UniProtKB/Swiss-Prot annotation:
Composition-biased stretches (Basic and acidic residues): 572-589
GO molecular function terms attached to this record: microtubule binding
Gene Ontology CC terms: centrosome; cytoplasmic microtubule; midbody; mitotic spindle midzone; mitotic spindle pole
Subcellular location: Cytoplasm, Cytoskeleton; Cytoplasm, Cytoskeleton, Spindle pole; Cytoplasm, Cytoskeleton, Microtubule organizing center, Centrosome; Midbody
Function comment: Microtubule-associated protein (MAP) that plays a role in the regulation of cell division; promotes microtubule stability and participates in the organization of the spindle midzone and normal progress of cytokinesis.
Lineage: Eukaryota, Metazoa, Chordata, Craniata, Vertebrata
Organism from which the protein derives: Rattus norvegicus (Rat)
Name of the molecule in the record: Microtubule-associated protein 10
């Protein structure tokens, strides 16, 4: 008991870095270590050794560790014997000893060094790079059987077991329990223990550190090789006991494989992915997160049209609240992890809505970007409280519902009518389809409109026709029938009526809120019937059976009541113009032959004029609104008087180009005014040349861009007389006919374009190629004839025209921008797309507008919208203009 109580526990760790031999070896040698009379520890080289660190070196990079129970007196001069052995191919022959060395162990000190290996005759054979450490773990516990009980609860009774095996990983230390009676336990890195125990030869001549007998050393290494071969073959071990014990060997039971950590067995650390999946169990959370999207695809789609880029409205919050009630309350914190931009993409709960609004108010630049994107996407913010206080003045015009101006009121009404028409068309019975699921029990009123991904907004293009032929031929037939029906409706209504586009409506609300309210008659006849079309559109009931075409496809309303409203509004504007034209007939005494010739020239192209393509609301409101943005507030009341019916001489009458203002101001004709109008019309002519191919099918009438020149030239005539107006008016009428007959199919404008360009091509894709050729030749001839007649009437106009062409173009371009800056609330956002070198010109143009006469202002305002066609404001339009056949 005294001897047992004096024993201590030590830990021996060995790591072989590399071995280098002076003479090359045919096979990789093994390194064996032996301390005192313990069984040797064999370390085998790896199967695929690493690149040699030195010339002729063999990389090991592995080692072993074991626990020793010794008396302190046995380690007075502890020497570790290291031997380099050449292993045979088969376990029968004895291993060949290549070299050996002695290493002095110092307890509790770890050392790394290179030791010289010497052969049996003390010659140098190589070097061994080794790290070793002997650690004193303290006094061994008095109850020795307690350590032995988990090892062999039933089978190990007084006999000792030895297990020698090779670790599979680099520097993985495996414990080995030994004592003076030669008991050793060593585990493999992969956790497999002895499976086929086989007895080993008993060591009759025990080798110690001081032995020099070569035969005894050779027998001792043979014993180590037998153990190592058994372990390296199939992880089996050979239980043995050295000579001093004198006990019989008994096989170890298979229960040794059930060792746990209490036996000081070093096992590899558990892999994180094998345990975290069971602890976290994220499968339930994943189901909860995906569930609202899987069960309610309609609800999420319904929330998108109502969701504004700054903050969601109340309806998506209700939807989300109803959806979240079915899921655990853990998900209520998920939207808080989203950023301000992501929170706007999807509806968020009420508690996160306030935090999102607060975060947006702290980020004014982000707020401005979101507001600009909302305006460009035709989604004005409904709640002005979510706008940053410093930016509220920018978007004040976008949040107003009713406005004192009649135009703004009609636009807001038309917007609400469009929305209600969408809801009535797309969601006929929303409650009957969704309430059985229990999703919308809290929703009051009609749910938000459902987003339809296959909606045709820009007419039937060539690209869409080709896609539909491959994917859905049935829908292609439906779309072609709708195109034919729309064209027949347009022929019945007339060439002048157009549905305005969406961007002008958004951009001109703030500008028109500064204009005084107008009379109903003025509203109907303003700017060639564009406002009358607004009034008709705002009065359309949303319950029309065909009202979907007005909202989705941009054609005219396809009902009899709608056609009557459109025709009545058009006739009223026409009667107002006829009264003013008859009043101005007295001033028209010169140029009757010219007008007759113009009428005769217009006759051949009248069949092509009757085919007037429709326009979508998104691309149509733009044309009607740019003119109103450019005009100053003081000129808004003069629009009915300035308005002209240049293209109304189709019935054979004279071209009427004088207004009621001619009777008040009979200004003598001046060369400068005529030359200015001529140069401006030449600038307009530059944008009417055919530049597109026929790859686009959205047929659009060029006459949509005529209202601005009509009003501008009418203002010229009212101020400068009828003599200068006849030649330019004749040119206008012929050019209008040629452009009407030769308009081209243009692609839709991209929604991301801040300012949609007015540039359009002028070649109409008709089913009759002869009609197209005749219309083009007629337009060329008419423009050439008009230029010749003008040169005859005014011989000196060509020189002045060349001299003033540049200045007029400069004034037109800058005047449009300056007036747009002063009258549109949206230009503060679009100004980032303007060239930076125009600031001085814009300031100069503003001074010119303030100091010039009213007629000059009208010229600038009228033709300013034409200059917008000379600029490409968006990369999408550059692609469309330069690469025909591509739509964005």
């Amino acid at each position: 008991m005294a001897a047992t109580a004096a024993e201590r526990l030590f830990s021996l760790e060995l790591l072989v870095d590399w071995v280098r031999l002076d003479s090359p070896c045919f096979a990789s040698p093994a390194v064996a270590f032996r301390l005192l009379d313990f069984p040797p520890l064999l370390i085998l080289p790896p199967a695929a050794p690493d690149p040699e660190p030195q010339r002729g070196a063999i990389t090991f990079g592995r080692g072993k560790a074991c626990l020793l129970r010794l008396r302190p007196a046995a380690l007075r001069r502890p020497r570790l014997r290291a031997a380099l052995l050449q292993l045979p191919a088969v376990p029968t022959p004895a291993p060949l000893l290549l070299g050996a060395c002695d290493i002095l162990l110092v307890p509790s000190v770890g050392q790394r060094g290179i030791f010289t290996l010497r052969g049996p005759e003390a010659e140098r054979v190589g070097e061994l790079a080794l790290f070793y450490r002997l650690t004193d773990l303290g006094r061994f516990p008095p109850g020795a059987p307690q350590l032995r009980s988990p090892l062999s609860p039933a089978c190990i009774t007084g006999s000792e077991a030895l297990e020698v095996s090779e670790p599979r990983t680099k520097e993985t230390s495996k414990p080995c329990t030994k004592d003076t009676s030669a008991r050793c336990l060593q585990c493999v890195s992969n956790g497999r223990f002895l499976e086929a125990p086989e007895p080993c030869a008993k060591d009759t001549d025990n080798w110690s550190a001081g032995d020099s007998d070569a035969s005894a050393v050779q027998k001792s290494w043979e014993e180590a090789i037998l153990h190592s071969k058994a372990s390296s073959g199939d992880m089996a071990s050979a239980p043995c006991s050295p000579a001093p014990s004198g006990r019989t060997v008994s096989p170890v039971s298979l229960e040794v494989t059930e060792l746990d950590f209490e036996t000081n067995t070093f096992c590899p650390p558990p892999l994180y992915y094998t345990h975290l999946t069971q602890e976290k169990a994220p499968s339930a959370r994943v189901e909860i997160t995906i569930e609202p999207q899987r069960n309610e695809p309609e609800d999420l789609e319904d929330a998108f049209p109502e969701t504004k880029p700054v903050g969601p409205t109340i309806r998506p919050v209700k939807h989300t609240r109803a959806a979240i009630q079915e899921s655990p309350p853990v998900l209520l914190n998920l939207p808080q992890m989203q950023g301000p931009g992501e929170a706007n993409e999807a509806p968020c709960p009420p508690q996160t809505e306030q935090s999102t609004v607060g975060a947006i108010r702290q980020l004014p630049l982000l707020n401005a970007l979101l507001m600009e994107l909302s305006l460009l996407c035709n989604q004005p913010v409904a709640n002005p409280s979510q706008v940053h206080p410093h930016l509220a003045w920018l978007y004040r015009g976008e949040h107003k519902g009713p406005d004192p101006s009649t135009k703004s009121t009609s636009r807001s009404e038309s917007k609400s009518n469009k929305l209600s028409a969408q809801e009535n068309e797309k969601l006929v019975s929303p409650q009957s389809t969704k309430n059985p699921k229990g999703k919308h029990s809290k929703i009051s009123g009609s749910p938000p409109p459902k987003v339809t991904k296959g909606r045709l907004l820009y007419g039937l293009t060539n690209t869409l026709r080709l896609r539909l032929q491959q994917t859905n031929p049935g829908m292609l037939v439906v779309h072609e029938k709708r195109e034919q029906y729309r064209r027949s409706q347009i022929r019945a209504v007339g060439p002048k009526f157009r549905i305005p586009s969406w961007k002008g409506k958004v951009s001109s609300l703030a500008a028109e809120s500064q204009m005084p309210p107008q009379l109903p008659g003025d509203t109907l006849t303003d700017s060639n019937g564009k406002v009358s079309s607004w009034a008709v559109q705002s009065q359309l009931p949303p319950q029309l059976p065909r009202d979907r075409s007005l909202d989705s496809y941009g054609s005219f309303a396809e009902g009899s009541d709608t056609s009557m409203l459109i025709s009545s509004g058009f006739d009223e504007s026409s009667r107002t113009r006829e009264a003013k034209q008859s009043h101005a007939m007295k001033k028209e005494t010169v140029g009757q032959s010219e007008n007759k010739t113009v009428t005769s020239l217009r006759a051949p192209v009248s069949p092509a004029v009757s085919v007037i393509p429709e326009r979508s609301p998104r691309s149509n409101i733009l044309r009607g609104k740019w003119k109103k943005q450019v005009q100053s507030p003081g000129l808004s009341r003069q629009d009915p008087a300035v308005d002209k019916a240049v293209g109304e001489g189709i019935d054979g009458k004279q071209v009427k180009a004088a207004s009621a203002a001619d009777t008040n101001e009979n200004r003598p004709p001046s060369r400068k005014s005529s030359c200015e109008s001529t140069s401006e019309l030449q600038c307009w002519d530059g944008s009417t040349s055919p530049c597109y191919s026929e790859d686009f099918c959205t047929t659009e009438n060029n006459s949509r861009s005529l209202p601005a020149p009509d009003s501008s030239t009418g203002a010229e005539y009212a101020q400068k007389g009828s003599w200068a107006s006849k030649s330019s008016e004749a040119r206008l009428s012929t050019r209008k006919n040629s452009s009407e007959s030769s308009s081209v199919f243009t692609p839709p404008f991209s929604a991301g374009s801040p300012v949609c360009s007015q540039k359009r091509s002028r070649v109409l894709k008709t089913h009759d190629s002869l009609e197209e050729a005749s219309s083009l030749s007629t337009s060329d001839f008419s423009s050439q004839w008009t230029n010749e007649k003008e040169n005859q009437a005014d011989p000196g106009s060509s020189k002045i025209r060349r001299r003033q062409d540049r200045s007029t173009k400069l004034k037109v371009g800058t005047g449009h921008k300056s007036s747009e800056k002063s009258h549109s609330a949206r230009t503060s956002q679009v100004s980032s797309y303007e060239p930076s070198n125009l600031s001085e010109l814009e300031l100069k143009a503003i001074d010119d507008i303030d100091s010039a006469s009213t007629g000059f202002q009208e010229e600038e305002d009228g033709l300013g919208s034409l200059r917008i066609s000379r600029q490409c404001r968006d990369i999408c339009e550059l692609v469309i203009n330069k690469l025909p056949g591509y739509t964005v």
